[in-house]
């Protein structure tokens, strides 16, 4: 794959509904709940470390959860991968690498608009439509929002691609616009 050093990509991440709540011990990019004070705005700028393991945020999120928690199975993850490839291909975008796990999705997207949140909305919306058709009904499957981290230059883009490639527990992935099923571990 050829990457021009003045190019950019988006490392886009979103989660399945209820599976990775604010306050999660693994890490999270969400507002942090401080009892008696309200919320501290999420930190989602390049170079900002992730926040992790905050019990008050986790407990508050569980209280506010309105639908069942969603965990993708291998077939659903592969459908998501195929939908991301189709959405990107239709728009002339490239997904260099994506990883679909039971509880979240990472995608490195190139040749796309500078508006990361818009790119994420397109990908999530297309994946939702495919899952809705698969389930035969509407079901709240994604958390609102997500993370859009812009990567500029070859080194940053290749680092993001490697980060996504190294994800554990992948059910499906995309390797240079090819959806692939992952072997069960």
What are these regions (language model features)?
Residues 1-185:
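Short catalytic/metal-binding and nucleic-acid-binding patches
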């Amino acid at each position: 794959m050829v990457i021009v050093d003045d190019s950019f990509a988006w490392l886009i991440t979103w989660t399945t509904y209820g599976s990775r709540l604010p306050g999660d011990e693994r890490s999270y990019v969400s507002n942090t709940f401080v009892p008696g004070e309200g919320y501290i705005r999420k930190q989602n700028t390049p170079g900002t470390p992730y926040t992790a393991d905050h019990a008050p945020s986790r407990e508050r999120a569980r209280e506010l959860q309105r639908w069942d928690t969603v965990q993708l199975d291998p077939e659903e993850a592969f459908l998501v991968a195929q939908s991301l490839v189709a959405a990107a291909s239709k728009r002339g975008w490239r997904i260099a690498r994506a990883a679909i796990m039971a509880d979240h999705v990472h995608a490195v997207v190139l040749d796309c608009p500078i508006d990361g949140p818009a790119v994420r909305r397109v990908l999530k919306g297309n994946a939702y439509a495919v899952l809705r058709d698969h389930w035969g009904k509407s079901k709240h499957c994604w958390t609102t929002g997500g993370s859009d981290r812009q990567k500029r230059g070859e080194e940053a883009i290749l680092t993001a691609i490697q980060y996504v490639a190294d994800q554990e527990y992948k059910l499906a992935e995309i390797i240079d616009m090819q959806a692939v099923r992952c072997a069960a571990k």
